[in-house]
């Protein structure tokens, strides 16, 4: 089991983090229009998976704003903002904040399938059931080429 921390206290994660050099696990997440988005939808492009607990936290909201700025100048790259927030809340946030260069996706519908495959589901602590803050980059061939996990999500 992988570990992270919340405000200095250890938090257990379901499974293990994906590994650099391995094939990215397939996933199905929910878009704002309630349709599905899968790993195959990004085939042939770099995918940046910005994974976080909730847009209702300052640090997570800031990360989405920053990735939105960076995504504007990245050819052949798609940035996915992934949380357990409902698609309606994600859409409201993106509209209010002028976020248009990232795709907000929710892991609410499929019983944490994505979170478990990527090793980011918090299984204890005050944020149990939410996603641990991390970034995964998938290359155009579908391989994980970079992984960052936050040592202490706030």
What is the predicted role of each segment?
Residues 57, 148-154:
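Conserved small/polar residues in nucleotide/adenosyl-binding loops
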Residues 24-25, 48, 132-134:
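Short loop/turn microsegments at loop-to-beta-strand junctions
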Residues 97-132:
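Short, internal strand/loop/helix patches
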Residues 132-150:
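Thiol-/selenol-based redox modules, centered on thioredoxin-like
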Residues 61-102:
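Structural microenvironment flanking redox-active thiols in thiol-disulfide oxidoreductases
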Residues 28-46:
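A short beta-strand-turn-helix
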Residues 40-58:
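Short active-site neighborhood of thiol/selenol oxidoreductases, capturing the structured segment around
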Residues 1-30:
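N-terminal targeting signals for export/organelle localization
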């Amino acid at each position: 089991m992988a570990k992270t921390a919340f405000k200095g206290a250890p938090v257990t994660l379901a499974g293990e983090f994906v590994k650099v050099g391995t094939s990215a696990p397939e996933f199905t997440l929910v878009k704002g229009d309630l349709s599905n988005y899968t790993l195959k939808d990004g085939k042939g492009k770099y995918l940046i998976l910005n994974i976080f607990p909730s847009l209702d936290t300052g640090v997570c909201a800031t990360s989405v704003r920053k990735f939105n700025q960076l995504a504007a100048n990245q050819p052949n790259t798609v940035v996915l903002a992934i949380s357990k927030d409902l698609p309606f809340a994600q859409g409201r946030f993106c509209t209010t904040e002028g976020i248009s260069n990232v795709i907000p996706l929710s892991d609410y519908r499929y019983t944490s399938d994505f979170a478990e495959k990527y090793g980011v589901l918090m299984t204890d602590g005050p944020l149990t059931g939410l996603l641990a803050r991390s970034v995964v980059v998938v290359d155009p061939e579908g391989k994980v080429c970079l992984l960052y996990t936050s040592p202490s999500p706030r």
